[in-house]
């Protein structure tokens, strides 16, 4: 992203959410986007996934402007996992994951032997091969989320974007999901980018954090760009420069920069 401006049009005019954002995603890394409600995380994610056009600046993917890709070509480079569930509850797990191959199949969507192999590898990568014949409506929230991640893997894209993938999961499933996404980013050399409100898990498991905030007073070594709403760095960098303390700490809530943990006062 180079000098990116994000926002959207409303009945009352254009709403500018953030401007002059400069950042990049690396392959082989898990990057987590965190920030307060209403600060613009969803708008940024929708802009990165080409659902919203940028107001200014440029997004480049593999060195080429995002707007120059056709929808079919973009679907081979970028996979998106949304929070809401699909309405195709009568599909099986394997059938839904197979839909991830649609950018590569012909008009009728017939899967080749190679496609079927990729589907099976994707199911195995997230640990749900044994669930492949289950109907979607029989799955738990955690199993369903794994199915959607497997579908994204089946697209064989270098970039996967996820909108709050742990939002409706219990705590053990949240941990398992983020651990799995970190592993997939590292093992498959993918860039995996997600928004989340699970701050402490993101701090512990992300390779990089993108923190959206209204104040841009954070110093180096964390990367930042004056005028944007985004501070980028490793969890350690953002702890040392005060970004995480500024974002997390309130009355009764303390962020320990040494251990990267959050402590809540009981008094």
Question: Can you name each region flagged by the protein language model?
Answer:
Residues 34-36:
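The feature captures the beta-strand-to-loop junction immediately N-terminal to the Walker
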Residues 49:
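Helix-to-loop junction immediately C-terminal to a conserved catalytic motif
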Residues 57-65, 74:
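Conserved ABC transporter NBD signature motif
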Residues 135-139:
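Conserved ABC ATPase signature
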Residues 160-163:
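Catalytic Walker B motif of ABC-type/P-loop ATPase nucleotide-binding domains
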Residues 196-197:
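H-loop/switch region of ABC-family ATPase nucleotide-binding domains
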Residues 236-240, 246-267:
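ABC ATPase nucleotide-binding domains
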């Amino acid at each position: 992203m180079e000098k990116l401006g994000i926002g959207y049009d409303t009945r009352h005019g254009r709403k500018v959410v953030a401007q002059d954002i400069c950042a990049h995603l690396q392959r082989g890394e898990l990057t987590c986007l965190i920030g307060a409600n209403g600060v613009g995380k969803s708008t940024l994610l929708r802009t990165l996934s080409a659902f919203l056009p940028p107001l200014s600046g440029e997004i480049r993917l593999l060195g080429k402007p995002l707007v120059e890709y056709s929808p079919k070509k973009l679907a081979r480079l970028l996979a998106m996992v949304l929070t809401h569930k699909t309405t195709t509850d009568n599909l099986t797990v394997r059938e839904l994951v197979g839909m991830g191959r649609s950018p590569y199949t012909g008009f009728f969507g017939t899967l080749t032997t190679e496609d079927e192999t990729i589907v099976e590898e994707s199911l195995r990568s997230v640990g749900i091969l044994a669930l492949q014949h289950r109907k979607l409506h029989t799955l738990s929230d955690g199993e369903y989320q794994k199915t959607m991640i497997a579908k994204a893997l089946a697209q064989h894209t270098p970039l996967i974007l996820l909108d709050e993938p742990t939002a409706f999961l219990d705590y053990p499933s949240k941990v398992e999901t983020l651990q799995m996404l970190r592993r997939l980013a590292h093992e498959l050399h993918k860039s995996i980018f997600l928004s989340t409100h699970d701050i402490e898990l993101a701090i512990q498991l992300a390779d990089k954090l993108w923190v959206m905030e209204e104040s841009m007073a954070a110093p180096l070594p964390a990367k930042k760009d004056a005028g944007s709403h985004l501070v980028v760095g490793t969890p350690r960098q953002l702890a040392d420069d005060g970004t995480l303390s500024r974002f997390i700490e309130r009355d009764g809530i303390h962020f320990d920069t040494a251990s990267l943990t959050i402590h809540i006062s009981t008094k």
